[in-house]
Amino acid sequence: MAEDGSPKIYSRPPRDSSKTPTEADIFFGADNTIPKSETTITSEGDHITSVNDCTADGDFSTTVNKLTPTKEKLKLEEDIEASLKSTTLPEKEITTPTETTNSKPKESITENFIPVKIGNISSPVGTVSLIDFSSNMAKEDILLATIDAEDKEVKPTTELSETQEDSSANDEDTSVPPDENTETDVSSSTSSDVPDDGAVQVTDSFSPESDVPPSTEKEVTTIPDNVAEDKVTKIDLIVSEDRPKTVTKLSDSEEEKFITVFELTNSAEKAKDNPEDPLTDEEPADGVNTWVEKDAANEAESHAVLLTAVESRYDFVVTASETNSVVVEEPHVDTKNSPEKDAAESVTNVTEEFPSVTSVVEQSGNKEDLSTNDSGIFKLLKEEPDELMM
């Protein structure tokens, strides 16, 4: 019973006598339309009253204000405050982490991101991925300051760490040196949370880039060294007979060299073993007689193509008068002996006009006497003429 004698009236049967209707019923209008029952029976007595007599249509909050006395209002206010506190306490528990997340979670974010950056900088490729710090631009300035150090000369770890600390101190306090007093700042937390080893890691990340160029230079320099050792030069063996002077000016130092694809066979070893044996008309087969058939064996020796192997490289030593014989090679294969005689005469004329050529030919003839034009052809076939033609 209330103080004025009026019974308590509830819109629905009470769950507990001590509890009041919930907040949603009062403030949020969950039960704006009250179920209009004819009678309600209270728990305090057998009084039967009509709800329509004392309850007006409208919000339940107005009816509560009309029906509840002062003690009930006090209980309601206390319960509402308690319920509001119970609802606001998780909000405070949520807001206090959000207030702390403004400092500590950001610190944890920077603690998580900065090792990622150092890992990206320490990659051998040298690519740096910047993470977008939209909340604080000072972090990008710190990262750019560390990246700009890449363009400068690479210094030792101690010097680079000192220069980074000096540049960060001069940068309008954008990067604060690690202090324990400045843990609240997000920008200071980035610098305070990062240990001093971060500078060492950054310098270690830049040091491979300084090591990369000498390694690449070594790779580049080895290629021209291999080419320079070979000394590959190209000449045309076919020279017109009208201009023999261009060929006869060759000397020992001017002998043209170029690499051949084939390998030297046993005939070259025979040439080295027997350098003084002249090549006569009886040794080669009939098909090769067109190349060798001349008045004197000295002419065949002097006008031969010499194949020499110097330091495991195969060289053609092209003498002065041999180039004229190369020009005459094609008609000699199928024609008669008349062009051979003309070629021999032209060769002898050249040797008589330029006696220096004979000295060159004699010096080269001392190396290999048996390696003539026919032997050169069979060396290309990697077979000896005796095995084929005899």
From Swiss-Prot:
Residues with Phosphothreonine modification: 280
InterPro entries assigned: Ca-bd_spermatid
Cellular location(s): Cytoplasm; Mitochondrion inner membrane; Cell projection, Cilium, Flagellum; Cytoplasmic vesicle, Secretory vesicle, Acrosome
Molecular function terms from GO: calcium ion binding
Coiled coil: none
GO biological process annotation, one example: spermatogenesis
Segments of skewed composition (Basic and acidic residues): 330-344
Location of region: Disordered: 1-23, 82-109, 146-225, 330-390
Residue numbers bearing the Phosphoserine modification: 251, 267, 312, 346, 356, 371, 375
Gene name of this polypeptide: Cabs1
Source organism (scientific name): Rattus norvegicus (Rat)
Protein name: Calcium-binding and spermatid-specific protein 1
